[in-house]
Amino acid sequence: MIGCGFVGSASVFALMQSGLFTEIVLIDADKNKAEGEAMDISHGIPFASPMKIYAGDYDDVADAAIVVISAGAGQKPGETRLDLVNKNVAIFKSIIPEIAKRNFAGIMLVVANPVDILTQVAIKLSGLPENRVIGSGTVLDSARLRYKLGEHLSVDSRSVHAFIVGEHGDSEVVAWSSSNVSGVPLSEMCEMRGHYKHKENTAEIATAVKNSAYEIINKKHATYYGIAMSVKRICEVIMRDEKSILPVSHMIHGVYDIDGVSLSMPAIVGADGIESDIPINLSGEEALKLKESADSLKKIMETIEL
């Protein structure tokens, strides 16, 4: 774990409980911070599975299965994720070459924001194959959507199948047209549960999901538990070679006329990272919004010097 702030530390805590790893190394510019977090989290090991958790350095990256990068400036109240571009690209310019020097051959998972931009930056700076560099993308946004829909319909959110695609940020797109609850189209399920204002309800839910991070940051200055669980889930899929479908951020080539940009689309994820895209059905309006989201990210990438 590179970066031991709120997100990095919460993610290590979640991973400690998962039983996925026998060794977790924490790396941070502030070595004392990394050591303190490692000590604190290690004291929970007797309640989990045997493993080693310790503060290390970039030499520990060489034989790692997964490197998670959460290092970066955090989002402050009033800031968008894209406001963090210049600060965090500069941080990545110092981190990624250090990883590349160690001939790292595992999976790189980018969590820092803006995650779509930084995933593409990591691909360019690392020289790793595109399929081995993944961003956490809209895995958390999609979980928030499923949670909200489960709450709205009074059903288990695990039975809700719905994705948010595009940017992890303000231009994200809810793929309503492919959303369902255990195979029942969402609009039908809403009526079955006594909700008939489908258009108004979906608009309210989409807005609530998009603004949830801003709301949490305004109330407690950071979000970390939800993303920690997202990191744990992505790591599970990779380590167990589950070939699960997750809306992670990755390089897109030729899906919905989008090419050469990293954003979130459902993909089959396993031990080798991205196996293939799953081009889910989108309405004409959703596809147009997705293209706009991609174009906005592309314009930002064009301004970055690497």
Locate predicted features:
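C-terminal substrate-binding/catalytic lobe of Rossmann-fold NAD(P)-dependent dehydrogenases
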Residues: 126-132, 142-306
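Glycine-rich Rossmann-fold phosphate-binding loop(s) that bind the pyrophosphate
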Residues: 4-5
